Design a protein with these regions (language model features):
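A structural motif
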Residues: 24, 92, 188, 234-235
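Conserved, mostly hydrophobic/aromatic
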Residues: 19, 27, 51, 87, ...
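N-terminal pre-domain/capping segments
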Residues: 1-92, 157-161, 257-270
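Acidic-and-aromatic substrate-binding clefts and catalytic sites of carbohydrate-active enzymes
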Residues: 5-12, 30-43, 66-76, 102-108, ...
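Short beta-strand segments at enzyme active-site cores
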Residues: 28-29, 59-61, 93-99, 132-135, ...
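Acidic/histidine-rich catalytic cores of soluble enzymes
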Residues: 27, 59-61, 119-219
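A general structural detector for well-ordered alpha-helical segments in enzyme core domains, enriched
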Residues: 15-18, 43-50, 79-86, 114-121, ...
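Active-site acidic/histidine proton-transfer and metal-coordination neighborhood
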Residues: 13-17, 50-54, 69-164, 171
Length: 270
């Protein structure tokens, strides 16, 4: 599955065409790029027909969703209503839940409050058979696997779990440890493959958005991480998300082929 951020300079219709041409069977879709497409005259129905014609399923609806009470919507942050409308219209498998303001759960945000909010989001998503996964990342208020798992297990919703992004797992408190993922694997509903440079940047946000490596090209144990998840019983689709200025500069068709082949090598244990 091609994660949208790997071809972030393309609009959604062009991105879908490139993904299909490279052999992907699914993509993730950002809410803001659906907004852009609708402004250009597309409807959810016409976007879905286009994706169907290309043989692409929408594996994830990604991006900022204001699921915590009190969070405002914006050009980048969609309401829960909008996110669920898009997910339904595009027949998406899952929805990502992020805490992007850096309000630390258990410090700035009451943990029980967050658990209740996630449970409410899962309840609403469940009415349309949509999975929801919390994506943890180092500069989030949900910075590591244990925090994300505590929220998901506390909410105790059948359709709720966590997203594992390899770069986030490496650069955060988990330090890229594959072993901690075995027990967590049944709760892992989404996986994003990528890799990390040998030396962490002083600006982790900048590295996150501009300096990720292709799967297998850095210091992350991509293969062991994927194997640990499979060994533990994870059945989520594996996506590839490489935010990289170097990748942005490549021809999109070439970039898509490269990320697909890199992910396939990792998953085959090469």
């Amino acid at each position: 599955m091609l994660c949208s951020g790997s071809l972030r300079r393309l609009d959604l219709p062009d991105k879908a065409a490139v993904a299909s041409g490279a052999g992907f069977q699914g993509i993730s879709v950002y809410l803001h790029e659906v907004r852009d497409a609708r402004r250009d005259g597309w409807t959810l129905a016409s976007l879905r027909r286009m994706l169907d014609d290309l043989g692409l399923a929408v594996a994830e609806i990604d991006g900022q969703v204001s699921w915590l009470p009190g969070e405002p919507t914006s050009e980048r942050a969609a309401s829960v209503d909008e996110a669920l409308e898009v997910a339904s219209g595009l027949a998406a498998r899952s929805l990502t839940a992020l805490e992007w303001n850096g309000h630390r759960v258990g410090v700035d945000l009451d943990a029980a409050f967050v658990v209740d909010a996630f449970g409410e989001l899962c309840s609403r998503a469940g009415s349309q058979e949509l999975l929801v996964h919390i994506e943890y990342f180092p500069f989030s208020g949900i910075p590591d696997l244990s925090t994300a798992l505590a929220i998901a297990t506390g909410a105790a919703c059948e359709n709720g779990g966590v997203m594992v992004d390899v770069w986030h797992h490496v650069r955060g408190a988990d330090g890229g440890d594959p072993d901690v993922l075995v027990a967590a694997a049944p709760m892992v509903l989404g996986v994003q493959l990528n890799d990390a440079a040998p030396e962490a940047s002083a600006d982790v946000r900048d590295e996150c958005m501009h300096g990720r490596e292709m799967p297998g090209a850095g210091v992350a144990a991509c293969g062991p991480i994927a194997a640990a998840l499979r060994r533990g019983g994870c059945r989520a689709p594996f996506g590839v998300e490489v935010f990289s200025d170097a990748l942005d500069d490549r021809d999109p068709d070439d970039a898509a082929r490269r990320v697909r082949e890199a992910a396939r090598r990792v998953l085959r244990g090469r």
